[in-house]
Amino acid sequence: MSSNPDLKGSSFTLSVLHLSDDQVENAVSFLQEKVNQAPTFFAAAPVVINISKVAGDIDFLQLKEGISQAGMIPVGVAGCSDKRMQNLAKEAGFAVMTASKSPSQAPAKMAPIKVVRTPIRSGQQVYAKDGDLLILSHVSAGAEVIADGSIHIHGTLRGRAIAGASGQTEAKIICNDLQAELVSIAGNYWLSDQIESEYWQKKTMFSMANDVLHVDVLAI
């Protein structure tokens, strides 16, 4: 059996910081605020910078340093078609990333649903790889539940729920009592302060439509 390294292509869900201008200080302050709100979710997480809406020059060295000081790991720049800007980004240590034009691969075969009957306590993490996650109890504040598919919680969601972890935008999050610290589908997330009060402590379903996260109250 060969013991040589092997280089293969793969796909990952990464957070993307979309800049609207060249004001690096504002971008770093925004990112720091998000990290402070959910440090367990964002700390040491990789982030890509999308600069497609930026008209002026960007101080990439300052941007990279600021992102690192905020607690995240800057890995690349997207939305950059200008060769000079690409070179500046590369000189600062960013990878220049482009959207893939190849057809998407067929989704992997889903695993059987993972069922958890006990409460998920603070500090615990449960992950359903290649499948859905069903929790028949509560998810405490400080706990994290993750699934490559959908997440169904029959109790109260007080912690973090991350569905579609490997990029499935059709994933859903359903909970009987919404009090979440964070909900995320395919890398699109809301923190607790982004959830309107009309949905709080209600039976709800989160889904994606047109690359935007939506929430609905369930009447059943």
Swiss-Prot record:
GO BP: any one term: regulation of cell division
Keyword Transferase carried by entry: no
Database matches in SUPFAM superfamilies: Cell-division inhibitor MinC, C-terminal domain
Bilayer-crossing regions: none
Domain of life according to the entry: Bacteria
UniProt KW keywords: Cell cycle, Cell division, Septation
Pfam families: MinC_C, MinC_N
Family: Belongs to the MinC family.
Record note on quaternary structure: Interacts with MinD and FtsZ.
PANTHER family: SEPTUM SITE-DETERMINING PROTEIN MINC
Role, per record: Cell division inhibitor that blocks the formation of polar Z ring septums. Rapidly oscillates between the poles of the cell to destabilize FtsZ filaments that have formed before they mature into polar Z rings. Prevents FtsZ polymerization.
HAMAP family, A to Z: MinC (MF_00267)
Name of the featured protein: Probable septum site-determining protein MinC
Annotated source species: Vibrio atlanticus (strain LGP32)
Name of the gene: minC
